[in-house]
């Protein structure tokens, strides 16, 4: 028994440093992924814009994305709950707009490129203009949010937490304006020659003239047709239709 006890102590003495090194390695990797870091923000934005440039079929109205610290702060607050349940839309609202949301959870910190790649891989189940199957095992919402033409701001966060005693890492990105409109989710962008919708505001196949406002009514074109843009309803809920002329909206 004494020999077995001694062997156990030796094994434990060897194992503990290994576990400590593994925890330190995970912590170091996590610290390199936090979105307070400018290089991480740049990586996230650049990957999204690269993916948006290469959609098939090509997009005529795809906006260039930029980092939003306000959206990122909302994502940081929500990510700390370590909950994969979609957040309340009011918790991811910005002035003049609402934001969409993508989430992913891992057991070990992986690169943002890998996470965004997982979301984008849903494109294999999506065909522009066609409605995706209702099969519960198939989702394309993460992909369509990434390539939603009018989403021009992005802010993301990563949180370290534990579930049932095991480490977990929650990745959250907020996209503004929000995408995945149920009525048009099969067409996240307009097809055509890149920048066809913004010939005077084009940068490497992406439009740079977003409408900063958001229509909160789905039928604002009808509302404005009958009420005009000076009516209290359209002033509050149809700002994009009333205030943006040539901008992408």
UniProtKB/Swiss-Prot annotation:
Which N-terminal stretch is annotated as signal sequence?
1-21
Query: Cellular component terms, GO, for this chain's entry?
Result: extracellular space; nucleus
Name the domain of life this protein comes from. Answer: Eukaryota
Keyword set includes Acetylation: no
Q: In which tissues is it expressed?
A: Caput, corpus, and cauda regions of the epididymis, the ductus deferens, sperm and seminal plasma.
Q: Which GO terms describe its biological process?
A: binding of sperm to zona pellucida; fusion of sperm to egg plasma membrane involved in single fertilization; regulation of acrosome reaction; sexual reproduction
Q: Record's SMART domains?
A: SCP
UniProt key word Glycoprotein: yes
Query: What keywords are annotated for this sequence in UniProt?
Result: Disulfide bond, Glycoprotein, Signal
Under Gene Ontology molecular function, one entry of this record is: calcium channel regulator activity
Record SUPFAM superfamilies: Crisp domain-like, PR-1-like
Q: Which segments constitute the ShKT domain?
A: 211-244
Domain SCP as annotated: residue spans: 45-175
Q: List the disulfide bonds.
A: 195-202, 198-207, 211-244, 220-238, 229-242
Glycosylated residues (UniProt): 230
* Family that this chain belongs to: Belongs to the CRISP family.
Q: What does this protein do?
A: May have a role in sperm-egg fusion and maturation.
Record-given protein name: Cysteine-rich secretory protein 1
Which species does the entry assign this protein to? Homo sapiens
Q: What is the lineage of its organism?
A: Eukaryota, Metazoa, Chordata, Craniata, Vertebrata
Q: Which gene encodes it?
A: CRISP1
